[in-house]
């Protein structure tokens, strides 16, 4: 193992130890949770730590007191702490980029235990992992393969009722991934409980040919922070994220960051 790789893992351990010593409850997500649930290992540029928004200030203060640079990158969902000896960082996540998937007590109540970097940890539950990943459909990133692999590995253990409750009125997004799962794994379609798929298809059938009433609204901004901006800016659709989940200023900062990353 290279010295650089050792330093990365040392940094991760230091962050975990600081948060543990500060009695700040956290969950591990991202690539490390994906590996825990599916066995699929991949290189990753960072560590994703999830916590309740109420614990964010304490977490950043503890890391800052230990000498690490910290920041609130986006006020509606993301903080960061940076290693002083490398370009490595840890994402500190308390919501999703679209404002929908807030980390709450249910995440912690259902978090499985494991180890990471030689430390006992809890991982984000598979249900909440699927829920959060389902809304990532950017041009440069799409988590559909992750969801297919999670369904393939964990479908028989999933709390499907809780997953349905998480998606709630966004059930069409879940149905889209279940449909794709049946396409990706045609010989293992039965892993998805028939009552789940039939229930979602009944909902879909009940809406065929029916428009929602009211001013035109675009829910595409829940899926991509940039690709549906034209609908809002030029075509007269209301951005469904505001003002309930994000302020207009948070939306603009989040969208501008996407444009900057593409340069």
Give the ranges of each region predicted by the language model.
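Conserved catalytic core of two-metal-ion nucleotidyltransferases
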Residues: 64-105
